[in-house]
């Protein structure tokens, strides 16, 4: 029984990734450099932590969509459904960012001469989403506490300077994530700032165009 209990505990290496992942917010370069180790053993060690980060970021992302702001406009919608909807929608967003976003980053890096793997590109995207994951525990609780259910329907008291401030902080989290992605590309490839920015810009061009197109309709 003791042996079974010990084997169920996270090893020091596994625990280190649960500490490394949040550390990307304050000391990103060493965390990203650790992604250079792509041995199967090391990839397995960090997988759970990275998927947790991008999963939380996905929930934060879905809460900021126009759909969320009008969710309760439907009379049949219930407040109790919002957490379930946010979780499922966040999971979808996280998977899309991880697989599609990772693929776009991988393709952009290869285009500019990178030799890294698709798996490492996905890990970069996951780690870079840490600011959005952080906003789920900092920005969103305060925003929901201030505006309550009015945040999820139109015509409430959630419009005005205060809401624009929260919106600005939310978009700042996206900007922070983009900056971390540039730092991550530079760290794992050993590239210049210009080449790293170009890689992230090329990878994000298609998603940006799609978002702009959806806004114009």
Map each language-model feature to its residues.
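Hydrophobic alpha-helical transmembrane segments
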Residues: 50-52, 87-92, 99, 122-125, ...
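Hydrophobic alpha-helical transmembrane segments and adjacent short intramembrane/lumenal linkers
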Residues: 105-106, 114-216
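Membrane-helix interface/capping segments
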Residues: 70-74, 101-115
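N-terminal juxtamembrane cytosolic/stromal segments of multi-pass membrane proteins
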Residues: 1-60
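Hydrophobic alpha-helical transmembrane segments of multi-pass integral membrane proteins
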Residues: 50-64, 96, 100, 177
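Juxtamembrane "helix exit" motif at the C-terminal ends of alpha-helical transmembrane segments
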Residues: 58-73, 211-214
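Hydrophobic alpha-helical transmembrane segments of multi-pass membrane proteins
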Residues: 18, 88-96, 165-175
């Amino acid at each position: 029984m003791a042996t079974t209990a010990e084997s169920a505990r996270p090893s020091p290496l596994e625990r280190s990734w649960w500490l490394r992942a949040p550390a990307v917010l304050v000391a990103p370069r060493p965390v990203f450099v650790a992604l250079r180790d792509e041995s199967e053993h090391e990839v397995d060690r960090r997988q759970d932590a990275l998927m947790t980060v991008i999963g939380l970021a996905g929930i934060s992302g879905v809460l900021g969509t126009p759909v969320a702001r009008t969710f309760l406009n439907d009379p049949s919608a219930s407040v109790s459904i919002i957490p379930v909807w946010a979780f499922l929608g966040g999971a979808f967003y996280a998977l899309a960012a991880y697989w599609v976003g990772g693929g776009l980053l991988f393709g952009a890096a290869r285009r500019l001469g990178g030799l890294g793997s698709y798996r490492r590109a996905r890990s970069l995207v996951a780690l870079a989403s840490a600011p959005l994951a952080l906003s789920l525990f900092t920005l969103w609780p305060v925003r929901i506490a201030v505006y309550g259910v009015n945040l999820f329907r139109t015509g409430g008291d959630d419009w005005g300077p205060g809401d624009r401030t929260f919106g600005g902080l939310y978009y700042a989290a996206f900007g922070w994530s983009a900056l971390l992605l540039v730092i991550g590309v530079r760290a794992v490839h050993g590239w210049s700032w210009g080449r790293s920015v170009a890689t992230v810009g090329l990878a994000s061009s298609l998603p940006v165009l799609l978002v702009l197109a959806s806004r114009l309709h």
